[in-house]
């Protein structure tokens, strides 16, 4: 009787163990609750997620935990591609039907041994990362993509997520990443659908693309189809070097972006080759497309580009053509251009009605251009339609440039003329904004 009981116990234990590892929709150990998350301990477990995710099985409300450093085993001689979880959800950047909606905690473990080589303009070459699509409820946190990985893909390429509507937090990329076409980011390729957050994440890898390469985020979807912009990049740090083959769109934090960037730092070197069409190069954001919110960011890296080169922002595009304030940003790196619109904080604005104003910003980096025409260069701005507001600082010892404030503190805008077309002029030794035939101070108080 005792032997029979012992045999029954062994069989029961085996059945229970088997149930824990293979009876759920992911074929992972665990039950998917916060107290008993699905366990990811091998490359095979990531493959199991990729194989089993679908529009009806996105992981919504479920928890996943990486329990060990994971080596995929790839090398240059024997490449192993990214798992590209939820790629089936993507038709294009404007049509992302679903994504991974679970909560994945990397446990500060490192992913290694990925040698990704699919970089053609086809289904295999596009939208590659560990996760191709992250849904609105999806969270990926505390995950490290190691330095021995290598990623060369076509577009919207990154280490952690390709297209994201969800939240990426406390993730690190140490690998070099290349996009044969556009939009390479150290942490995420592209934010879509008006939502998506990247918080407290760092990049150490070198990021390259044909156009738009950035340390944290390649870019974000923008346009009139998005009615509410909730994109956020906050407290992120880039240490990696950036460049593009078209000399278009390199930046320390984000390439083409619409939304809020706060308290981010770039220490990477940004160096673009000499090209007549080169544009949009900056320490934080290469080009703001629509909604502009930029506060508390710092650039410490040296920046070399062609035109539209800024310590913080390269260019503010026309976009929604609304007013915006760039505040409390600091540039400490050298800013060097070869053409027009070179600025220590913001290089250029293409807005016709919207006024871009700088407040509480500081530049201590040397700003130069090799262009013969040196009328569109300044220690703070590279275009006269950008307003120098209150409490900005140009460090002592820097050369006075064409678009710097004059000695009496008045910006270089002709009295009551010249810039009236962009709704601002100097009145009584102060910059005044015109809106609907009324005058306002830079702080928004109406002048009667």
Predicted region positions:
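Bacterial Sec-dependent N-terminal signal peptides
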Residues: 1-21, 163
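Terminal non-domain segments
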Residues: 2-8, 40, 427-431, 435
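Basic side chains
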Residues: 2-3, 109, 141, 423-424
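C-terminal outer-membrane/trafficking sorting elements
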Residues: 416-448
């Amino acid at each position: 009787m005792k032997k029979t009981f012992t045999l029954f116990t062994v069989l029961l234990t085996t059945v229970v163990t088997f149930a824990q590892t293979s009876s759920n929709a992911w074929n992972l150990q665990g039950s998917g609750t916060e107290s008993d998350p699905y366990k990811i301990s091998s490359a095979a477990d990531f493959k199991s997620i990729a194989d089993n995710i679908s529009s009806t099985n996105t992981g919504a409300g479920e928890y996943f935990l990486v329990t060990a450093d994971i080596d995929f085993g790839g090398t240059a001689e024997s490449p192993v591609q990214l798992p590209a979880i939820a790629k089936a959800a993507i038709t294009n950047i404007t049509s992302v039907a679903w994504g991974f909606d679970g909560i994945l905690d990397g446990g500060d473990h490192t992913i290694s041994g990925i040698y990704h080589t699919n970089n053609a303009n086809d289904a295999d070459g596009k939208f590659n990362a560990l996760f191709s699509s992250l849904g609105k409820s999806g969270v990926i946190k505390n995950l490290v993509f190691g330095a021995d990985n290598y990623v060369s893909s076509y577009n919207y390429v990154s280490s952690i997520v390709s297209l994201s509507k969800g939240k990426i937090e406390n993730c690190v990329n140490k690998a070099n990443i290349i996009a044969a076409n556009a939009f390479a980011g150290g942490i995420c390729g592209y934010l879509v659908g008006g939502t998506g957050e990247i918080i407290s994440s760092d990049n150490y890898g070198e990021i390259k693309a044909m156009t738009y390469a950035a340390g944290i985020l390649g870019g974000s979807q923008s346009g009139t189809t998005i009615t509410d912009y909730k994109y956020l990049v906050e407290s992120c740090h880039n240490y990696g070097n950036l460049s593009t083959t078209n000399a278009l769109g390199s930046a320390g934090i984000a390439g083409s972006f619409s939304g809020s960037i706060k308290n981010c730092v770039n220490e990477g070197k940004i160096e673009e080759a000499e090209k007549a069409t080169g544009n949009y190069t900056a320490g934080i954001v290469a080009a703001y497309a629509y909604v502009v919110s930029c506060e508390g960011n710092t650039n410490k890296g040296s920046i070399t580009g062609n035109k539209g080169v800024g310590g913080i922002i390269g260019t503010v595009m026309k976009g929604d053509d609304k007013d915006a304030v760039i505040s409390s940003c600091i540039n400490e790196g050298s800013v060097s251009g070869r053409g027009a619109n070179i600025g220590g904080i913001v290089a250029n604005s293409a807005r016709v009605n919207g006024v871009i104003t700088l407040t509480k910003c500081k530049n201590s980096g040397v700003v130069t251009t090799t262009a013969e025409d040196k009328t569109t260069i300044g220690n703070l701005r590279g275009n006269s339609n950008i307003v120098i507001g209150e409490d900005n600082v140009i460090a002592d010892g820097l050369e006075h440039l064409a678009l710097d404030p004059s000695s009496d503190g008045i910006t270089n805008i002709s009295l009551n003329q010249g810039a009236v077309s962009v709704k601002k002029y100097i009145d009584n030794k102060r910059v005044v904004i015109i809106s609907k035939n009324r005058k306002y101070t830079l702080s928004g108080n109406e002048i009667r």
